[in-house]
Amino acid sequence: MRKTKIVCTIGPASESVEKLTQLMEAGMNVARLNFSHGDFEEHGARIKNIREAAGKLGKDIGILLDTKGPEIRTHTMENGSIELAAGSQLIVSMDEVIGTPDKISVTYDGLIHDVSVGSTILLDDGLVGLEVTDINKDKREIVTKVMNSGTLKNKKGVNVPGVSVNLPGITEKDANDIVFGIEQGVDFIAASFVRRPSDVLEIRELLEEHNAADIQIIPKIENQEGVDNIDAILEVSDGLMVARGDLGVEIPAEEVPLVQKELIKKCNALGKPVITATQMLDSMQRNPRPTRAEASDVANAIFDGTDAIMLSGETAAGNYPVEAVQTMHNIASRSEEALNHKKILSARSKQVSMSITDAIGQSVAHTAINLDVNAIVTPTESGHTARMISKYRPQAPIVAVTVNDAVSRKLSLVFGVFATSGQNHSSTDEMLEKAVQKSLDTGIVRHGDLIVITAGAVGEAGTTNLMKVYVVGDVVAKGQGIGRKSAFGEVVIAQNAQEAAKKMKDGAVLVTKSTDRDMMASLEKAAALITEEGGLTSHAAVVGLSLGIPVIVGMENATSILKEGEDITVDSARGAVYKGRASVL
């Protein structure tokens, strides 16, 4: 079962209900809408189709709105493009002009105040590099030297590595797009070109003004300034996207893998989801199979600790959108098999100060690994407990049961968490019982599984204070257990020693009213013993202890409740009998 989440960008190649359904079946968890392209009508139609496809499949698919952000671009060029020659002089004007080989202009007129002589300006994702040689503030012009030849087309991106650019946190377009997203009920805002915490707070203020504070903000780190301010940015954010495209232009390419590892590590420490994005399976826009380097890139992001991996052009405009998702699913699933969960847990358990929820999350992860449980089940109001458990990367899947569909969708970015909708409860016992039932409904948990349940006060977020180890089973009957062992076997019912001698076989569970010394030969074959007669000093109790087999005494009507030949699990520690095979301690 894949735990890494997959984010898919939706575009012309994937916007139909039919194609979206195929993407979801292939493994898409979150749909990304890139607001650098398209209008409200297009994106509104895509959101409608996403919800229709998700509804058909009964899936909770998160929707992520990716803002265009406060970027810098060139204006238009003469005849659509110009040729720039290495060594030539190029003036960058703050006033809009038609671009020529001698002079171009940019959309941000404050650039002249941010750069200095010696600064580097990169055009079109670094295709052409410029070095600032002079600044003429009277003419509002930056004089540069072209570092390498290249063709420059209309409205290309401008990057200024190593320079703190005083662009606004969000533009007017971004604000309008976010308000549209609020009206459409999106789950995440991916904020482009975040440089400082105030950029995130501007968006949070806008969300609060529109009563949408529950929408999560995922800053995209795309420049050196964002990397430098990462700790402060994470304090006010709900997660992070490592946007390696622009980041690789702003900082040297050889630094990108190291920055990726560091950003992921910081998110892991805080229990905040992190998305690794850009060019993960880029060649699959054109080819049905990825390059070996791309497969390694996806795997290494998972080894680094990413919660989610993202597809951009591969699903938005590529020729093989469904195949790209399936490929990413296959690589992620195989890579997860190589994760050393004990090592990860040990490394992340060295945190000194923590909240009660964090402490419970760590304890749950330790218990899950030590007992090799089948699943972790957590009823949750806000999703916080599930995130805190995921932080420690337990091997067992985390089933988060929530009454809030929006919380369920927000957990679609969190590693190892499988959210399902529950219902309101009046007591903790009822909440736990219903959570176990919902986990059974998902198919992740089955009867006989050993699970860990963690929860808090009913209806209150942030109160997690309970952990329970539980066997999910059909409890057939109960009595008084002797010892702490368990056994699985076929039921043999005997009313007396003669019947027992005739029917008993090695490894069976002997069920009888009472035992005596005439039954010793049969008892020596038994995997477990159940009697209707009670008492810690009864013959059955004493003999069972001496033979070292699990015994349950005082089980009323055991010879009529249990059926000849049925398979059961005897748990003497709890004095319980489960139908079929159950995982008990």
From Swiss-Prot:
GO terms for molecular function: ATP binding; kinase activity; magnesium ion binding; potassium ion binding; pyruvate kinase activity. Substrate binds at residues 32, 245-246, 278. The record marks 220 as: Transition state stabilizer. Keywords: ATP-binding, Glycolysis, Kinase, Magnesium, Metal-binding, Nucleotide-binding, Potassium, Pyruvate, Transferase. Pathway: Carbohydrate degradation; glycolysis; pyruvate from D-glyceraldehyde 3-phosphate: step 5/5. ATP binds at residues 34-37, 73, 156. Pfam families: PEP-utilizers, PK, PK_C. It catalyses: pyruvate + ATP = phosphoenolpyruvate + ADP + H(+). Mg(2+) binds at residues 222, 246. NCBIfam families: PRK05826.1, PRK06354.1, pyruv_kin. Belongs to the pyruvate kinase family. In the C-terminal section; belongs to the PEP-utilizing enzyme family. Homotetramer. This is Pyruvate kinase. It comes from Bacillus licheniformis.
